[in-house]
Amino acid sequence: MIIEDLGIIDYVAAGELQRQRLEGVLAGTGPETLFILEHPPVVTLGLRGGAENLHVSEEYLRQHGIALVHCDRGGNITCHYPGQLVAYPIFKIQAKTGGIHRLFWCMEETVIRTAAHFGVVAERAEGRPGVWVGPRKLCSIGMGVKRGVTWHGLSMNVSKDTGLFDIITLCGLRGASATSLEK
C-alpha cells in the first residue's frame, strides 16, 4: 500500500485519480492506495441523492465559486472545503478488513482517536453514520465498492470555518450541524 498526499485538488480530478487507481487494483497492476487531500469548495450529492437538502440555487453556488457534483459514493449530501482532511482508501476490503462494515468502524475509530489526541471527545451516534462531538458532526463517511475494492472515503473537519455546511441539510439529517477539531 502507498500513501499519496495530493494537496488541494478539484473533486472531479480526484475522482478520476481514484478511478484510475481502482482499475489498477482490480486488474492487479496497481497498488492499494490511501489518498490524503483537501478539495476547493464543493457540494457533493451521493447515491442517496440529497438535492432537496441543498438550500441555495445552482446560480448561488456558481456566484460563490462552489462546485456541485453528483457522484457515485454512498450517502447523501455533504460539503468539502480547504481545511477539511479527506482520505480516500483504495483497498481490497475482504483481505484487509473482513468487509465494508468493519472498514467503516476502523475509519470511525481512527477519527475518534485522532480527535482524542487533540483533546476532543468524539463518538459514534446510534443510527447516524460518521463521527460526532455531541450533536455536531465532525466526520462524514461515504464510500463506494467495486468488486471488493473501496473508493471514496471520509472527510474530517479540521478548520473552524464550517460555514459551507449552512447551505445544506448535512447528510440529509434534519437538525444536524457540523463542528471541527478547531472548534
Show which residues each predicted segment covers.
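Short conserved catalytic/interaction loops centered on acidic-Pro-aromatic/His motifs
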Residues: 120-125, 151-152, 164-168
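Active-site donor-binding loop signature of nucleotide-sugar glycosyltransferases
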Residues: 8, 143, 183
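A hydrophobic, small-residue-rich beta->alpha segment in the mid-to-C-terminal subdomain
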Residues: 163-183
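N-terminal lobe of the biotin/lipoate ligase/transferase fold
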Residues: 1-138
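Short, conserved beta-strand/beta-arch hydrophobic-aromatic motifs that form part
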Residues: 54-60, 138-162
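A short beta-strand motif that forms part of the nucleic acid-binding face
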Residues: 49, 145, 172
